[in-house]
């Protein structure tokens, strides 16, 4: 089972050895060295996440470490979100399969969360004890009234929960751990460290592009799946508001990435007070790479916030730990319209 270990994940020499080890004819019956096996499993996990394969894929610590460096080197928001969600679900499954309480305690400890099964137990279904602050932080990200603090037994600063609730809390803490750890690795450092597998990285990127483009084209046009930021920009444009350059760039690049053609994008800007169709078409061609040679990607959520273009309000999906990009929101909604 996975036991999160930030020190191991950030061990560049370990990661370099995993990346550099070549297939050997000895040591394993299948002809793979241990490091090569780790590398193979890590790439397979990321690719399965990219392709939307929701089958349970158990992974170990070293594989998880290499997966993080793959994500850092790729630096693709949707690939990162999908992979971490798949890892989250894998962790939850493993937590539900543990045979010893101590394993959950150790898992929580690795994430800085104190869990106890030795304290007073209130009711046969409430086996685990966790601090109120930790519970409130992570349980708030789980959908369902069952996981609300108001529906738990609370005593003297601790919450008493059953195994199901605890697994959900720990999986969300794991998501935070993954993003926090990933943020400590610079893309340039990741590329240099695992440069011997750049071809494999490109294969993952190509798999993503193919799968992503098919899904986007199939689902384009359903604006109900757009994130709140894009809906707000569209609403302002329709009302004749003079939307900022960054807002227009964000919308045009979002629509392009969502599979919209130039002719389909132009109408969104017709009510802008300074609308000029020739200029608008030129800018769309520039954003799409037809003129510039560089295809623009819409800004990340962090950039949208810093430019006062984030309108998440109470949208629960926007508040998910892994939600870092408007396209990620759209992709997730495409797969499951009811998700919150």
UniProtKB/Swiss-Prot annotation:
Keywords: 4Fe-4S, DNA replication, Iron, Iron-sulfur, Metal-binding, Primosome
Binding annotation for [4Fe-4S] cluster: 229, 301, 310, 318
Listed InterPro entries: DNA_primase_lsu_euk/arc, DNA_primase_lsu_PriL
GO cellular component, one term: primosome complex
UniProt xrefs under CDD domains: PriL (cd06560)
GO terms for biological process, alphabetical: DNA replication initiation; DNA replication, synthesis of primer
Entry superkingdom: Archaea
Signal sequence bounds: none
Protein known as: DNA primase large subunit PriL
Biological source species: Thermoplasma acidophilum (strain ATCC 25905 / DSM 1728 / JCM 9062 / NBRC 15155 / AMRC-C165)
Lineage: Archaea, Methanobacteriati, Thermoplasmatota, Thermoplasmata, Thermoplasmatales
Gene this chain is encoded by: priL
């Amino acid at each position: 089972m996975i036991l999160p270990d930030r020190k191991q994940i950030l061990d560049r020499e370990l990661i370099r050895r995993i990346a550099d080890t070549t297939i050997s004819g000895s040591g394993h019956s299948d002809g793979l060295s241990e490091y090569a096996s780790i590398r193979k499993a890590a790439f397979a996990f990321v690719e399965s996440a990219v392709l939307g394969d929701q089958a349970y894929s158990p992974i170990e610590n070293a594989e998880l470490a290499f997966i993080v460096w793959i994500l850092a080197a790729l630096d693709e928001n949707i690939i990162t979100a999908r992979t971490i969600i798949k890892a989250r679900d894998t962790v939850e499954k493993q937590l539900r399969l543990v045979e010893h309480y101590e394993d959950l305690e150790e898992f929580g400890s690795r994430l800085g969360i104190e869990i106890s099964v030795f304290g007073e137990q209130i009711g046969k279904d409430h086996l685990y004890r966790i601090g109120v602050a930790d519970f409130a932080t992570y349980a708030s990200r789980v959908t369902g009234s069952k996981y609300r603090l108001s529906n738990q037994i609370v005593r003297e600063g601790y919450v008493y929960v059953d195994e199901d609730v605890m697994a959900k809390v720990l999986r969300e803490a794991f998501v935070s751990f993954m993003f926090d750890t990933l943020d400590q690795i610079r893309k340039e450092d990741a590329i240099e460290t695992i440069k011997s597998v750049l071809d494999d990285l490109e294969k993952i990127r190509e798999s993503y592009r193919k799968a992503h483009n098919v899904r986007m084209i199939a689902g384009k046009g359903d604006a109900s799946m757009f994130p709140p930021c894009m809906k707000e920009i569209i609403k302002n444009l329709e009302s004749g508001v003079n939307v900022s350059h960054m807002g227009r760039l964000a919308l045009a690049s979002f629509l392009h990435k969502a599979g919209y053609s130039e002719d389909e994008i132009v109408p969104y800007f017709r009510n802008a007070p300074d609308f000029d169709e020739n200029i608008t078409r030129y800018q769309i061609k520039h954003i799409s790479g037809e003129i510039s040679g560089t295809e623009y990607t819409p800004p990340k959520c962090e950039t949208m916030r810093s430019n006062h273009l984030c309108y998440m309000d109470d949208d629960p999906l926007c508040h998910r730990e892994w939600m870092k990009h408007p396209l990620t929101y759209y992709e997730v909604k495409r797969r499951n319209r009811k998700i919150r």
